[in-house]
Amino acid sequence: MSEDLSKLHTSRMNKLQRKLRGEVGKAIGDYNMIEEGDRVMCCLSGGKDSYAMLDILLNLQQRAPIKFEIVAVNLDQKQPGFPEEVLPAYLDTLNVPYHIIEKDTYSVVREKIPEGQKTCSLCSRLRRGTLYGFAQKIGATKIALGHHRDDIIETLFLNMFFAGKQKAMPPKLLSDDGANMVIRPLAYSREKDIAEYAELKAFPIIPCNLCGSQENLKRAEVKDMLNLWDEHHPGRIESIFTAMQNTSPSQGVDREQFDFNSLQRDADAPLRGDVAESDLPAFDFVDVANNGHIDLDAAAKSRSENKIDIVSTYTP
């Protein structure tokens, strides 16, 4: 690599690192992901996302105003062809505490799932159970996963399209048994930034399809849809994620999220219109005894009085 290309490479890598560090730092702050004295178990799969997460967290650890530990953990599920030497060799260069757990979940999955059917769901449950149990064994107070913003948005649409649920992937989650706290520090980061950063850093990526499974076709379909939107409508993905952070249960239709049955109008409320009309003058209606047509344009002619006459009425 020429000197100019090397400088360009380093400059771009540093710029991306600053961006990712800022996003991760903001996510941690917004959701109180990491606290003083935490032992954070970083789950490392060998993919670009978990490598980037560990790299950024180690970087932030040196700058953070609080003290916390980082322990890297990989689960070797005994998939055929898994390069066992890659992760230990990489982690040794970081001088970070780590554990490699060996558990043959691959054989369990093959035994339980008929040939030709997808194994991802059972494999994921077995992996999650093992990691949750190990987190308690080593005294980890937080379990960090490498899911990013694109994963969160894709999950929302997957659940909407195929499960009839408005449910995504939260940046912070308490496990069902209440024993483990899961965090997703990359919740504000885009996959394309992470992919570029991983390439520039030359992380030793391990293929994720060693088990022979196919990519989830439904997720791939949603990902293609979102990529198309991102290409033709810049800013739409950002707007979707912003909307996910600004929900209003009273403006939806979920009866579990808002008690519509208890809504009662206030008979004594002043006639001031709706909040949506708050920028308009508050009018005194001269006569509303009969159903009729009210000339709201009259306001422009009589702003000093703020009174509107009934210009026509109809009584059936």
UniProtKB/Swiss-Prot annotation:
CDD domains in the cross-refs: TtcA-like (cd24138)
Lineage top rank: taxon: Bacteria
Cofactor descriptive note: Binds 1 [4Fe-4S] cluster per subunit. The cluster is chelated by three Cys residues, the fourth Fe has a free coordination site that may bind a sulfur atom transferred from the persulfide of IscS.
InterPro entries: Rossmann-like_a/b/a_fold, TilS/TtcA_N, tRNA_Cyd_32_2_STrfase, tRNA_thiolation_TtcA_Ctu1
One Pfam family matching this protein: ATP_bind_3
Function field: Catalyzes the ATP-dependent 2-thiolation of cytidine in position 32 of tRNA, to form 2-thiocytidine (s(2)C32). The sulfur atoms are provided by the cysteine/cysteine desulfurase (IscS) system.
Misc note: The thiolation reaction likely consists of two steps: a first activation step by ATP to form an adenylated intermediate of the target base of tRNA, and a second nucleophilic substitution step of the sulfur (S) atom supplied by the hydrosulfide attached to the Fe-S cluster.
Protein name: tRNA-cytidine(32) 2-sulfurtransferase
Source organism of this protein record: Shewanella sediminis (strain HAW-EB3)
Lineage, uppermost ranks: Bacteria, Pseudomonadati, Pseudomonadota, Gammaproteobacteria, Alteromonadales
